[in-house]
Amino acid sequence: MTPIQEQLIALGGVFQAAVLVDRIAKTGQVSEAALSCMLGSLLVVDPKDTLDVYGGDDLNLHEGYRAMASALERDPATLQREPLRYALSMLGLERQLAKRDDLLEIIGKRIPVIQSQVEHFGIAHENVIAATGALYEDTLSTLRQRIQVQGDMRNLQQPNNASKIRAILLAGIRSARLWRQVGGHRWQLVFSRRKLLKELYPLLHG
C-alpha cells in the first residue's frame, strides 16, 4: 500500500463520518453496519495497515470515497456540500485537539472503558453510543471551534440521534488524526487534487 493510498483511506474515514452525520441529521437513519464500522475505528489500537482500522474492506468507506471524489473534482452537480463542510471542520478540530494534551488524556483513558462496554453489550448498543457521544461532548465540544450540524430539528433533537452524531464525529476526528499520522496535509487537497483523484478512483471502483 502506497503512502497516498494510506492517506486516502484515512481521509475516506473522515468523509464517511461526514456523510453519516449528514444522513442522520436529515433522515434520522443510519445502517447498523456503517455505524459499527465508524465506532469500531475508534477502538483499533494496533492495525496492520490503515484499511484495517475500517474492517479491512474498502466497501466500508465507499460513501466516504464518493463524497471525497466529488469534493476533489469540484463539480457543482455532484458536490456534497454539507459532508464537505463537516469533513473540513473535523480536520480543523483535529488540529486543535492535537494541542490539548489534557483532552487527549481524557480520550485515552475513556476509550478502554468504551471497549469494555462493547465486549459486554455489542458495538452498536445504545449504551456504547451514549458513552462515545458523551466523550465527544466532554472533550471536542469544549473547544472554541464547533461543528454546526444542519438538518431536520425533529431528528437532531432526539437524544439517541444526537449521541450517534457526536460518536461519529469523534470517529471522524480519529480518522483525521490518522490521516495526519500517515502524512496527510490540507495543502494536498488544494495542490495535489489530480494526483489524489488518480489514486482514489481505483479505491472507489474497486
Swiss-Prot record:
It comes from Pseudomonas syringae pv. tomato (strain ATCC BAA-871 / DC3000). The keyword Cell wall biogenesis/degradation does not apply. This is High frequency lysogenization protein HflD homolog. Pfam families: DUF489. Keywords: Cell inner membrane, Cell membrane, Cytoplasm, Membrane. It is found in: Cytoplasm; Cell inner membrane. GO terms for cellular component: cytoplasm; plasma membrane. The lineage of its organism: Bacteria, Pseudomonadati, Pseudomonadota, Gammaproteobacteria, Pseudomonadales. Belongs to the HflD family. It is a peripheral membrane protein. InterPro entries: HflD, HflD-like_sf. Its main location: cytoplasm. It comes from the Bacteria.
